[in-house]
Design a protein with these regions (language model features):
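Active-site neighborhoods and metal-handling regions in enzymes and metal-associated proteins
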Residues: 1-390
Length: 390
């Protein structure tokens, strides 16, 4: 079995939290430890499956005591991708015979708990407080009264904080796919007259083609006056672009379980940006540069925010929102670049740095400048390779 550094880190963190076993239920943590890219839960496959994909794992044994539990709809992909010892499947739906998905899910889970030796033992089980199904907690209470349940949300977040070499490679690829989207937008904005929908369709299509299949994509593509405020969800819409309009795209995409998050701002139609537009775009870029210079091992997340804020002040613009966040199997994870987060920056972290500058309600322009940054021992490395639009 290939060494699974992500699983080892999760085991170490949850073992330190006092756990003998961990039961993972969130999309990102199951993906993180198993290597199976758990699908975003939409569509018939998600609706017919009673429970989510789960991982049960002993905190002391990486090879013989790890199970991935998935629905029948996900079985083929899970068995191909999983790096855990066993992959077990529960039924969801049958077109010709009744099938109780709830019973299938809980029976499979009960069998795995027994195989792990939980029935006759006093053990501590770490769970995720936000995503563990109530039916699973009922099963634990009824069948395993001696189990002590521990919340491991913080332990898992800490385990994921420093990226492994495998994760860094995946984040590089995700950033490359983000570059394709941003470069396509830079091409499309050279001519006015397209709708936001048309541009979004073209650039996401090119991203899909580069990956080889459809991928989860979220974010916004806004043009004209809608760029002057931050108002999620904000696009795309049917609006037809005009020469001189701003175009701002903040796009996130998940590739092989890992995210990119990048933003750029343009002026549409080959029109030279006005001095007013340059003021906001250059303030955003100056804040990005200040944050980038400060993102070094030993600095604090709050110090990155302070450096960016000083850049805003030099441009006479008030900081409108946070400066960014870590990124990985979660699109927006800790630490975040805010004045109250004093987490030390460490090599192996990957950030999405995203300062913006907006004219505000009633205005016509706003800009945001976001790229993905790997922290190395010698300083920051910019993973995103597209050029600023202004």
């Amino acid at each position: 079995m290939i060494e699974n550094l992500e699983l080892i880190r999760a085991q170490s963190a949850t073992r330190a939290a006092g756990c003998d076993f961990m039961l993972l239920s969130s999309l990102h943590n199951v993906t993180y430890v198993s290597g199976f890219e758990v699908p975003v839960p939409v569509g018939a496959g998600a609706e017919t499956a009673y429970g989510p994909s789960l991982v049960l794992c002993a905190t002391h044994d990486a090879h013989n005591a790890s199970w991935l539990i998935v629905s029948a709809a996900n079985a083929t992909a899970a068995k191909a991708q999983s790096r855990l010892a066993e992959t077990l499947v529960f039924g969801t739906f049958d077109s010709f015979n009744p099938l109780d998905s709830r019973a299938q899910f809980l029976e499979q889970l009960l069998a795995i708990f027994k195989a792990a030796g939980l029935r006759n033992a006093t053990v501590s089980l770490g769970i995720e407080s936000r995503t563990t199904p109530h039916a699973v907690l009922e099963l634990l209470t009824r069948e395993f009264p001696y189990i002590r349940v521990i919340n491991i949300d913080d332990a898992l977040a800490q385990a994921r904080s420093i990226k492994t070499p495998r994760e860094i490679a995946l984040l590089r690829r995700a950033a490359h796919i983000g570059d394709i989207g941003q470069r396509t937008l830079a091409e499309l904005v050279q001519q006015a007259g397209r709708t936001e929908f048309e541009m979004w369709a073209e650039l996401t299509s090119r991203m899909y083609a580069a990956v080889g299949h459809e991928i989860p994509v979220s974010g916004e593509l806004v043009t004209g006056p809608r760029t002057c405020v931050v108002n999620y969800p904000a696009g795309p819409r049917v609006r037809t672009t005009q020469p001189g309009d701003a175009a701002l795209m903040d796009i996130s995409q998940r590739v092989d379980g890992y995210w990119s998050d990048c933003t750029n701002t343009h002026v549409i139609g080959g029109v030279e940006p006005t001095a007013h537009q340059k003021k906001f775009a250059h303030a955003s870029q100056a804040a990005f540069d200040a944050a980038l210079e400060t993102l070094r091992p030993g600095k604090l997340a709050s110090e990155v925010w302070q450096a960016a804020n000083a850049a805003y002040e030099k441009h006479g613009i008030q900081m409108p929102h946070y400066m960014g966040h870590q990124i990985g199997a979660v699109v927006n994870e800790l630490p975040r670049l805010v004045p109250y987060d004093h987490t030390p920056i460490q090599a192996g972290m990957v950030f999405a740095v995203e300062p913006g500058a907006y004219e505000g309600e009633g205005g016509t322009f706003g800009a945001r400048s976001e790229k993905n940054i790997l922290i190395t021992e010698s300083g920051p490395e910019v993973l995103s390779d597209f050029e600023w639009g202004i």
